[in-house]
Amino acid sequence: MSRRLIYVLNINRKSTHKIQENEIYTYFSHCNIDHTSTELDFVVKNYDLNRRQHVTGYTALHCYLYNNYFTNDVLKILLNHDVNVTMKTSSGRMPVYILLTRCCNISHDVVIDMIDKDKNHLSHRDYSNLLLEYIKSRYMLLKEEDIDENIVSTLLDKGIDPNFKQDGYTALHYYYLCLAHVYKPGECRKPITIKKAKRIISLFIQHGANLNALDNCGNTPFHLYLSIEMCNNIHMTKMLLTFNPNFKICNNHGLTPILCYITSDYIQHDILVMLIHHYETNVGEMPIDERRMIVFEFIKTYSTRPADSITYLMNRFKNINIYTRYEGKTLLHVACEYNNTQVIDYLIRINGDINALTDNNKHATQLIIDNKENSPYTINCLLYILRYIVDKNVIRSLVDQLPSLPIFDIKSFEKFISYCILLDDTFYDRHVKNRDSKTYRYAFSKYMSFDKYDGIITKCHDETMLLKLSTVLDTTLYAVLRCHNSRKLRRYLTELKKYNNDKSFKIYSNIMNERYLNVYYKDMYVSKVYDKLFPVFTDKNCLLTLLPSEIIYEILYMLTINDLYNISYPPTKV
């Protein structure tokens, strides 16, 4: 049911009576007009529809095109009563411009009718930005409105230049932005089918559009498409690649299309693989600098499958390895700095050195602390890499910075302190010594009260003393948890499993479980590899037969779990 008219014309007056200008303005600008109504019939017969308002320069046609209740049927009636479609408003807007950039649910027929009534060819400079503004309006204002393929075709056929630029953008720049934002969460845009998008882009190309035109920032349309965060429609991206966009063009920031995608804050693994494959298939080998930048920038970015992506990149780019540095940092440094735990895990598994320093002598732990943007995850990331750190000086440095560490999760902070007390046997004594110092107590006031902090340390220390009293064969549970040598820990595997279920340890139970699982899987894969290579070890023609089995086991234990797994289950080559 339509809304009641907010203004009703008096149609019972004599035809000789003059209709007031403000009445017409109100009627065409704000009323929900029925194309069959007697009011509309009365107006078009008794009023000069081409009369302009003094200030705005609007005619009846302009007013109606700005009406929120616009319909194609009413517009057709106005066009049939000889409205002037070439008159501009005071701001220079022509009716066809308003129609294409302001109105919803436009009929292709009325667009043709309006264009045909204008004797000027659309190549005239007054219409040069018409196609661009039509698509731009669908990108910026009328987000739920579709881009009509027939309208695009008509505008191009009528002579509009598809390469016209406004603020550096062409119509294709805006169209690619529309395609990217359709799939961005929260945008509420009308879906664009891949087939339709392909037809529209083909129309542009057929009419001479430059697919690699640059905006003021040096971006091609494909740059813009890939730079939109959460643009993750693999099928749309695959379709755009069929037009062979130029992958070598760098924008003003030195970024190629692939690097634009890598730095977009959201990476979909399958799209990343597709882009690199397309580049190497159609362009050739990627420059070493770009390969290095892709890997390092990827680590900084959120991705759907980080472990799969970093594995793919490291295998694909053979000259990028755990020792490669970029801006003075290794891959592992960057992974720690940006809290990418899955990448950290992978790089350590392939023998990345967690204790290596940057070119300006910073440890990975310091990079984590210095990155304030990731402060909510600082404790968790430090906690994650502590299992790999054996350098006592690094642990001591971490302990000294405890007052400045941001605390967002008490449980994580408690676990972090438990690690520090376990690995630094001077921590508790130094804490007790400084407990009464006002300066020391004040340093902890930023995130929690000193009493609460002191309580956590005391609780962890008490449980540490319990670890020292718990015997495991010829040593203590405390010594076992401090040990990082899987070969030595193997003999304590059964005892660790028993203590793992001991409810006396509330704080250190997680660390026990980590140690147990690490030793368990290491031992399992060493046994698998030994069994698999046994025919080699026992072959009389092999020099390895000269080595005692104990030495062979020692060598196998030097390998990472990842190395052992790959020997046990070699990756299949596609």
UniProtKB/Swiss-Prot annotation:
Name the keywords, alphabetized.
ANK repeat, Repeat
List residue spans for each ANK repeat. 56-87, 135-164, 167-213, 217-249, 253-285, 327-356
Ranges where the F-box domain occurs: 541-574
Do you know which PROSITE patterns this protein is assigned to?
Answer: ANK_REP_REGION, ANK_REPEAT, FBOX
Q: Which SUPFAM superfamilies match?
A: Ankyrin repeat (SSF48403)
List the InterPro entries: Ank_repeat_dom-contain_49 (IPR051637), Ankyrin_rpt (IPR002110), Ankyrin_rpt-contain_sf (IPR036770), F-box_dom (IPR001810), PRANC_domain (IPR018272)
PANTHER family named in the record: CYCLIN-DEPENDENT KINASE INHIBITOR 2C-RELATED, POLY [ADP-RIBOSE] POLYMERASE TANKYRASE
- Which protein, by its recorded name, is this? Ankyrin repeat protein B18
Species of the source: Vaccinia virus (strain Copenhagen)
